[in-house]
Amino acid sequence: FWDGRAKHLAEQAGGPPLNPVEMGMKDKASVVKRIAENQAVKDYITKHWGEEIWQDDEKIYAIMEQALAAFQQLDLFAQFSSKYDRTLAGQDKFTEQEALGKALFFDKEKTTCSNCHQLNDKDHREETFTNYRYFNLGVPKNEALIAHNKLGQDWVDNGLLDNPMVKGDIAQKGKFKVPTLRNVAVTAPYMHNGVFKELRTVLLFL
């Protein structure tokens, strides 16, 4: 999550099913009931944990979280097979404009993009394009999102400050996790609240 409230991937996986604006399931029991509708999944769980496991919604939900976390850590989710990766491997070439963009991106003095959007400054292979840290960029409110969720005009997204693990450190107010730039051209809208519709707007803002 952008505010870092999930301690690990399994905990994050358990969030969306019960979130009213994502999957909107009523409770864990409802999710477990839906899981049981898939006979192959039900048979697998029964085989490994026994028939009695279906009497414990909490345990089934935890199994789901762990399974999703394990799946999301497969190389399938990070194949590093983009044109950028192929070029580093000598299997492709950047256009002149792309090469200029790369030079600007990694410029540590002028554009400074890679100050936040780079994990390893010694080896650009298998780069995730985020340092996984948190910053307050002063991103404007997304009024449309606030209205849609009926939060009220005075509502403020405090970001990291609302994370229970931060414990009221006011210096963390408005900070959000640096996102990866992998597939950034096709993942609009942008910023933690989706306030910018176009990538060019992000560049002008920053």
Give the residues covered by each predicted segment.
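Intrinsic-disorder/low-complexity, polar/charged segments
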Residues: 8, 27, 55-56, 198
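Detector for methionine-enriched segments
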Residues: 23-25, 64, 165, 191
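Short glycine/threonine-rich turn/loop motifs
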Residues: 1-14, 83-205
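Secondary-structure transition/capping residues
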Residues: 20, 24, 79, 112-113, ...
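Glycine/proline-centered hinge or cleavage motifs at structural transition points of membrane proteins
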Residues: 2-37
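Post-cleavage N-terminal segment of exported redox proteins
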Residues: 20, 29-99, 103, 107-108, ...
